[in-house]
Amino acid sequence: VAPSASCAAFVKLYHPRLAKGNHECLTSKKIMDVVEFLHDVVKPTSLKAHFPHIVSVHNSCHGVRELHLSSPSERQEPLFNKIIDLLKLVDGITIREPERKDECCGFGGMFSIEEPDVSKRMGEDKIERHMATGAEYITGPDSSCLMHMQGIAKKENKPIKFIHVVEILAAGL
């Protein structure tokens, strides 16, 4: 069980390609993102968590398009969001989503290194959309996205906090 959607997606989808047919290692078939595991395997109907804050959910590119943690806006599919399903079990929480909810934050692994100015601008735009929801926190299952946006917000003194979704699900335990 991996705590980051982009890491889980890499191992699940790209590790077999790197192994070039050598399948002694079955990691790609066994790895799951923590949200995927909790939602699809554990299937909790209640949690003891208490988090009396307004949160805006960040749907990461890898989480949406590779792990199917939520439905992508560009497809005509029924809407679902495993992250929000789990957060709804938390007492006291107010859940929001930004405009253009599944648009990239600009991190994208090597993209942020190869195109740092574009990456920063995309992150700034995404943070502004999250802040426009009135949220106190931005949350999601992808540590790299959260770290990218948190770094930008800190440099620009933005009054928003960042927290991994699992920290909320475990709040008050």
Labelled PLM ranges:
Residues V1-L173:
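Iron-sulfur cluster-binding electron-transfer modules in prokaryotic oxidoreductases
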